[in-house]
């Protein structure tokens, strides 16, 4: 029952990539609306997969000390957000103009994602994170 919203999000991703549906957004200059809805749907649909992967890699945050959560909490949520962003850029490349600025944002996001992922899995020190980012 808890998976129904994620399944609906996955169906939305499939539906948004049907050429007839995707074509609705192009002539009306709604490409950014398409990107927003697709990115949200992809990210939401990927979240259970990322949570499962985090548990398998033991990339979890244990409760205790100053932490407010009372259960083991999977890390790596940034992976779902990054994958949603990257997949949308790939899926909507025919609708978007890839300026130098957008390429710079994509490169910067990739670097920050890589450092965040390594931190979630291996627990990097604050100094290493600061230097890398």
Task: For each feature predicted by the language model, list its residue ranges.
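"…together with the soluble PPM/PP2C metallo-phosphatase catalytic core" -> "…together
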Residues: 1-133
């Amino acid at each position: 029952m808890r998976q129904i919203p994620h399944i609906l999000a996955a169906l939305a991703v499939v539906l948004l990539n049907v050429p007839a549906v995707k074509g609705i957004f192009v002539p009306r200059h709604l490409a950014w609306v398409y990107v927003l809805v697709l990115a949200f749907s992809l990210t939401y649909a990927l979240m259970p997969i990322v949570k499962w992967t985090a548990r398998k890699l033991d990339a979890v945050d244990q409760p205790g000390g100053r932490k407010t959560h009372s259960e083991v909490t999977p890390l790596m949520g940034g992976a779902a957000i990054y994958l949603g962003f990257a997949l949308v850029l790939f899926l909507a490349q025919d609708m978007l103009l890839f300026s130098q600025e957008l390429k710079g944002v994509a490169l910067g996001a990739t670097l920050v994602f890589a450092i965040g992922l390594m931190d979630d899995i291996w627990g990097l020190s604050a100094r290493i994170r600061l230097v890398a980012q």
